[in-house]
A protein has these predicted regions:
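Short, Lys/Arg-enriched N-terminal segments with co-localized hydrophobic residues
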Residues: 1-4
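C-terminal motif of bacterial Sec signal peptides marking the signal peptidase cleavage site
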Residues: 18-20
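Extracellular ligand-binding/catalytic regions of CAZymes and related secreted enzymes
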Residues: 27-29, 33-39, 55, 65-69, ...
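Catalytic beta-strand/loop cores that center a nucleophilic Ser/Cys/Thr
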Residues: 64, 70, 88, 98-99, ...
Length: 331
């Protein structure tokens, strides 16, 4: 009689032990912290004037180091896989935008095929954040298809805040600065401007606001530029194109998804500007803000010290870019 009773007690003991173990495993699982999602930032470079094929890998390295982000840089390449910013009908690797948490874009007058353009427009319509530079006000140029003409002007204006209008002129590109940059009144406490100090930019001033033109949507200027050498001044056209214009702003864009995206845009972007820590700081602070990480921007701005020298070629068209280079993963 005692033997079956012992078996019964042993069975109960085993069941209790298993139940306790199961509860312990459950508790451990519930108390484990959720894995932090690493943001995927895709840098889209497709312009032939301002050497973004050099500045974007540099910014991507900073984003990887400071944010711990996964970074992808995509380029215009030729048929042999070499980086060729003069090729306007192809950017290799845009499918990376399908998994992107942020698109950082520097494009100029591209005539991409529909499949490639759709990667960009689908991303924009998703409501995910965007950071844009300079010539992205005229990212596309479609001359021979009236159904695509909206991408030449209306599309960048509604997404980024403005389309291509004019600038104050080229003067010995890269030999000396031509624009003084300062904080827009009332924006001193904006997190994107942490660590900011006034500087002189090599980027000649773009006209985006004033005269017959106005920044679109809820654009809020953060930085102002003052042109120190202006073709419009020489030509007596300052009533239309003021010497003072916004050079950086924030806005929102609500696409077909119904989700409101954060957009940071700057008309800065000359390759020599990125030699200045303050310009790299504006770019990186803007990236943090776009991702909703503004509370993690240090008081003096994001650390933008470089692990290697940044020695870009000067701005300019034609064959001024560095040759025989292929895309490579950001280390």
């Amino acid at each position: 009689k005692t033997f079956p009773m012992k078996i019964k007690y042993i069975a109960i003991l085993i069941l209790c032990t298993l139940a306790a173990c199961g509860e312990k495993v459950k508790d451990t699982k519930e108390s484990a912290p959720e894995e932090t999602k690493v943001p995927h930032i895709v840098f889209v470079t497709g312009e032939e004037e301002y050497r973004s094929e050099e500045s974007f890998p540099m910014l991507a390295k900073l984003a990887k180091r400071e944010l711990g982000a996964k970074v992808t840089v995509v380029y215009s390449v030729d048929n042999h896989g070499y980086i060729d910013p003069n090729r306007t009908d192809h950017i290799e690797g845009l499918d990376a935008l399908e998994t992107a948490d942020l698109m950082v874009v520097f494009m100029r007058f591209r005539n991409l095929p529909k499949k490639e353009r759709d990667y960009i427009t689908n991303y924009v319509e998703s409501g995910k954040p965007i950071v844009g530079f300079r010539t992205t006000t005229h990212a596309f140029k479609y001359d021979n298809d009236s159904t695509l003409v909206e991408f030449n002007g209306a599309w960048p204006a509604k997404v980024f805040g403005q389309q291509w209008i004019t600038h104050h002129g080229h003067f010995d590109d890269g030999k000396y600065p031509v624009t003084n940059v300062s904080i827009k009144e009332g924006q001193t406490d904006n997190p994107i401007l942490k660590g900011f100090s006034e500087f002189e930019a090599y980027s000649w001033l773009y006209h985006v606001d004033g005269g017959d033109w106005k920044l679109q949507g809820d654009s809020e200027p953060l930085l102002m530029g003052h042109s120190t050498k202006s073709q419009h001044e020489i030509n007596g056209k300052l009533d239309d194109f003021s010497l003072d214009n916004p050079v950086a702003w924030t806005k929102s864009y609500t696409g077909s998804s119904g989700n409101k995206a954060r957009v940071f845009f700057t008309t800065l972007g000359h390759p020599f500007d990125f030699k200045l820590p303050v310009v790299r700081k504006i770019a990186m602070n803007g990236i943090y803000w776009a991702l909703g990480e503004e509370d993690n921007i240090p008081e003096n701005g994001v650390n933008v010290s470089l692990d290697e020298p940044f020695l870009p070629n000067n701005s300019g068209f034609g064959q001024k870019f560095k040759k025989n280079r292929k895309p490579a993963p950001i280390q």
